[in-house]
Amino acid sequence: MDISAAVFNAARDGKLKLMQKLLINKSPEERAALAEERTEGGTPLLIAARYGHLPVVHFLLERCGANVALGGSVNFDGETIEGAPPLWAASAAGHLPVVKALLEHGAPVNNTTLTNSTPLRAACFDGHLEIVRYLVEHQADLEVANRHGHTCLMISCYKGHREIAQFLLEKGADVNRKSVKGNTALHDCAESGSLEIMKMLLKCDARMERDGYGMTPLLAASVTGHTNIVEFLVHQPRASREQRIHALELLGATFVDKKRDLLGAMRYWRRAMELRWAGGQAGALEKPTAGPLVPAYDCSREVSTAEELEALITDPDDMRMQALLVRERILGPAHPDTSYYIRYRGAVYADSGNFERCIRLWKYALDMQQSNLEPLSPMTASSFLSFAELFSFVLQDRAKGTLAARVSFQDLMGVLSKSVREVERAVAQRERPPEPPQFSKALSIILHLLFLLQKLRCGPEQEHLKRQTVYRLLKLNPRARGGHTPLHMAVDRDTTSVGRYPVGRFPSLAVASLLLECGADVDSRDYDNNTPLHIAAANGCPDIMAALIRAGAHFDATNAAQQTAYQLLEAQSSGRHALHPLNHTTLQCLAARAVTAHRLPYKGLISEQMEAFIELH
């Protein structure tokens, strides 16, 4: 173990004497350098502050000259916080003496993490009231929000820390501040069920605002199922009759899908219906005219009278469809919960073996997501992955003869086409290109869908449609992590891992062959100058290499490390393969390699075509 790791471990474990022994013979400059050396992403001072080792903190600051503001990586509850200053770590962990020591040595009180979280916000998160008081006394800014626009007051409300929320309000925290998504501290109370804090906020003139999804705190409480908040707010004079009706209807839907309490749902739906028809026909607030019937909902219609509502009791499945209809009407298709619970209901059907209902619901949710979310949204990616996992499960069990259900070409092809459309949307959005991890996941899921599609028998028209869709993908020239093309990914073992459950197995000769037949560039290069042939070789796949060579792959092209695919295969398989280099090497290749090996000048002396050929080697 090197000395920097030993110093870090001593700081982490609070072993002051060991640290002194390690550093006693070092010069001041060496001690300062070791105090700022990062191990596992963090400095000795950061890790000592995290675990509250005050003597070690004093030693590092006073004897080693440690930088009191230098941030790093630190772990809390299994999550790595990047760019966390020592003061943030001590505040989050609740170590008041360390907080005092760091501030006495000049730690900036508003120094933030990479996500713009302040030490004050960290203390508010975990309910450390004394630290909150101390930081505010030392000029901590109450209004510095994190990258999501979430303030100290908001997180105190969400976590239910009443005394901290009260203290912040007394110190003048903005009660109506909005986050990036438009939610206020009242929304956080509603989502967490913090009724007493909500009452405090309302006494401080908090306003019932709508967030970016059009949600009021009342609706937010209905979505999360906090009946105490709903009951309090529906009796407030500021809630209109229509708002009360919507809140009770939505709470009923939450009882169906989240709490799985159908009788409880009926109680709230009855109350909503009574409110709708209060005052008789003349004063009724009827539901809006229903749109077209939705096959995914089994063509169910929302009930509009008390008689129709009571008839639901005999049909639990119809009640579940009512919950989906109610949620879509009130929240709208853009709200994440609308598509989430449609997918949830589909998953319940799948668990009971009703795959047809599941697929219908999931397709409807996917269309909703693609119409309302950004391209390659994590929610949409999750939907595509769920389809791939479901199709894989059905195909495997059908092959074993344990399942009567089957996957149709139309279902699988429909999802594949939508997934390629998602990539097309992302590529078209040039001003906001997708993040590489999102793009990589999307391409990986598409390859898994192709893997499954290759297992189905296809007629000529179906084969044409499949190839047409693959061509649409290849035409975009999409690149995953490391510059991998779909062909690189098809011959890479790492593509196998896409979710929690197995789907396809890679490298896949079937998928690679399909991509080649549809025009994939067999000599395309990734960012390390690897061709698909290099990747296949590194994965020990001579059969796939042979297919690539038949498709025109250049056998002895070199990558950035000046390695050929054959050299990678030799290293991977220790010569246990039937691929013979002389069968694929031309005299022209040997000449090009000789020019490269002897560094002979050639640029400007031969044709551009010949120059490009030599550069391959």
Curated annotation (Swiss-Prot):
Q: What is this protein called?
A: Protein fem-1 homolog A
Q: Which cysteines are joined by disulfide bonds?
A: none
One biological process GO term for this chain?
protein ubiquitination
- Provide the Gene Ontology terms for cellular component: Cul2-RING ubiquitin ligase complex; mitochondrion; ubiquitin ligase complex
Q: Where are the TPR repeats?
A: 245-279, 339-372
Pathway(s) served: Protein modification; protein ubiquitination
Which windows of the sequence hold ANK repeats? 2-32, 40-70, 82-111, 115-144, 148-177, 181-210, 213-242, 482-524, 528-557
